[in-house]
């Protein structure tokens, strides 16, 4: 029976179809939008069909593998495959990118290039999550940089060039460490160089080399995740980017770092991860508090939401460092949960700023009366972000808590201190989110302006918000919807660990 290369189709289709955008009429913005929307919807439908009919939930091994010889000299293969760890981020990518394309409807300047870059990002992200070859993983990682840089520098705010340059310097710097790690891991082997994930997973390294490789990969992933102190590109980037780009950055780009940390550092370098995991837990705990306090001091609405993202990433780092089934499943759930919530907050924040022509919170006030729909949606997603029970964030954070408490890796006193500090972080979250809502939506400040007529959200904004809100509620009520995808894979990853 001949096997159809579904994964190759899913990875290549967006960028291949995106190339034909340049043959569309230069002034036909409407045609470009609908064409891009059609590509994204078709891709999402193919993805859903393939995973529904070809993916087996109870199989922790790699499924739907595509393996083609690409460059003979390097023994370089186009090798793709998915398992319980990668299926969630791939579906999240498809969902958020489709909605980000709809969110980018108002973009009219150079719309052909704008939409092509979004589709190029789409291919790069899915390629990274489904890659089963170290060099292919690196190539897909790099494929992200140029589209994001151009989207920032051409369609950003006043300081777009500064933030785009800062983004490229940070991420390209991290990529150097990733390349060194990939080459070091690929070239070390008794039977010659190998880049195959399956071979690398069974490879044993001297402890010193393993720690060096782990540290190199950690720096690369810490920039993308981001982990403090390598996070300073994120608020500037989010503060200047168009809100559709912010949706892709917050919803998917940050998750690439977390995915890499689990896929490469945890799965392939288990001895080094066992040594580094206490430090990850400490850094994650500090990050929750630090980013929450910094967020509280931000005047810029987008920067406040950006720092809230950094704070929420702390839970993923703690879950990865907990070395428990519950903790790691909680980290993966938080990864997906924040993908939805972060994208929605940036979308609503961006549309609000576009309407009132302000970005500073202390200049806003009283928007809830002229814009009740935006107020309702923004409040709902803020509640989801502060982990209100019944929403996805609550289950994810609770699982990370339980994971660190039940971990056999740490002493009881250590666990109590970490849990207390995390609890303080959870108390700080509603403080900065509710103060943001108060400054934006309450009071009478904007009614004193001469032209104080604002348009509430239209059908497009309402549709995007509801589409994101439904999975947030669904995961909050029935988290097994997502956990069932990764639970067997998590069990397999953690079977390599021993406690020191």
UniProtKB/Swiss-Prot annotation:
One of its GO terms (biological process) is ATP synthesis coupled electron transport. The keyword Protein biosynthesis does not apply. Its main location: plastid. The chain crosses the membrane at residues 4-24, 35-55, 87-107, 113-130, 134-154, 167-187, 208-228, 242-262, 274-294, 305-325, 330-350, 386-406, 416-436, 463-483. It catalyses: a plastoquinone + NADH + (n+1) H(+)(in) = a plastoquinol + NAD(+) + n H(+)(out); a plastoquinone + NADPH + (n+1) H(+)(in) = a plastoquinol + NADP(+) + n H(+)(out). Keywords: Chloroplast, Membrane, NAD, NADP, Plastid, Plastoquinone, Quinone, Thylakoid, Translocase, Transmembrane, Transmembrane helix. InterPro entries: NADH_Q_OxRdtase_chain4, NADH_Q_OxRdtase_chainM/4, NADH_UbQ_OxRdtase, ND/Mrp_TM. It comes from the Eukaryota. The keyword Membrane applies. Its EC number is 7.1.1.-. It is found in: Plastid, Chloroplast thylakoid membrane. GO terms for molecular function: NADH dehydrogenase (ubiquinone) activity; ubiquinone binding. It is a multi-pass membrane protein. GO terms for cellular component: chloroplast thylakoid membrane. Belongs to the complex I subunit 4 family. HAMAP family: NDH1_NuoM (MF_00491). This is NAD(P)H-quinone oxidoreductase chain 4, chloroplastic. It comes from Lemna minor (Common duckweed). The gene is ndhD.
């Amino acid at each position: 029976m001949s096997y159809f290369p579904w994964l190759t189709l899913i990875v290549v289709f967006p960028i291949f179809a995106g190339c034909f955008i340049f043959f569309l009429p230069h002034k036909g913005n409407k045609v470009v939008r609908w064409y891009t929307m059609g590509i994204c919807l078709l891709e999402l439908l193919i993805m859903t069909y393939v995973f529904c009919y070809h993916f087996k939930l109870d199989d922790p091994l790699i499924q739907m593998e595509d393996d083609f010889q690409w460059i003979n000299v390097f023994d370089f293969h186009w090798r793709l495959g998915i398992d319980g760890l990668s299926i969630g981020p791939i579906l999240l990518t498809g969902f958020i990118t489709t909605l980000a394309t709809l969110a980018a409807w108002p973009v009219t300047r150079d719309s052909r290039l704008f939409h092509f870059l979004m589709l190029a990002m789409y291919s790069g992200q899915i390629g990274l999550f489904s890659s089963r070859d170290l060099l292919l993983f690196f190539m897909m990682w790099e494929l992200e940089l140029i589209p994001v840089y151009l989207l920032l520098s051409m369609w950003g705010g006043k300081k777009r060039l500064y933030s785009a340059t800062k983004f490229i310097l940070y991420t390209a710097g991290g990529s150097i460490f990733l390349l060194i790690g990939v080459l070091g891991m690929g070239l070390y082997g008794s039977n010659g160089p190998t880049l195959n994930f399956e071979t690398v997973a069974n490879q044993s390294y001297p402890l010193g080399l393993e720690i060096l490789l782990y540290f190199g990969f950690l720096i690369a992933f810490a920039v993308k995740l981001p982990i403090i102190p390598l996070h300073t590109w994120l608020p500037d980037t989010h503060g200047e980017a168009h809100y559709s780009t912010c949706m892709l950055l917050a919803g998917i780009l940050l998750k690439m770092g977390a995915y890499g940390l689990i896929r490469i550092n945890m799965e392939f370098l288990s001895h080094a991860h066992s040594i580094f995991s206490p430090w990850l837990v400490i850094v994650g705990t500090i990050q929750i508090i630090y980013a929450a306090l910094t967020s509280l001091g931000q005047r810029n609405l987008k920067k406040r939401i950006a720092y809230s993202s950094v704070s929420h990433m702390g839970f993923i780092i703690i879950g990865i460092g907990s070395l428990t089934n519950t903790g790691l499943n909680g980290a993966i759930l938080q990864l997906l949960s924040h993908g939805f919530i972060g994208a929605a907050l940036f979308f609503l924040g961006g549309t609000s700023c576009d309407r009132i022509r302000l970005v500073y919170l202390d200049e806003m006030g009283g928007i809830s009366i002229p814009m009740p729909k935006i107020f309702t949606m923004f409040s709902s997603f803020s509640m989801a972000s502060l982990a209100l029970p019944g929403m996805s964030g609550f289950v994810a954070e609770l699982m990370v808590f339980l994971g660190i408490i039940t971990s056999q890796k740490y002493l009881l006193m250590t666990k109590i201190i970490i849990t207390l500090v995390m609890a303080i972080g959870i108390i700080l979250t509603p403080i900065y989110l509710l103060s943001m809502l108060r400054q934006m939506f309450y009071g009478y400040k904007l009614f004193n302006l001469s032209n104080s007529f604002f348009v509430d959200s239209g059908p497009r904004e309402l549709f995007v918000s509801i589409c994101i809100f439904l999975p947030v509620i669904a995961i909050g009520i029935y988290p097994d919807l997502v956990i069932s995808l990764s639970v067997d894979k998590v069990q397999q990853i953690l079977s390599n660990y021993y406690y020191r």
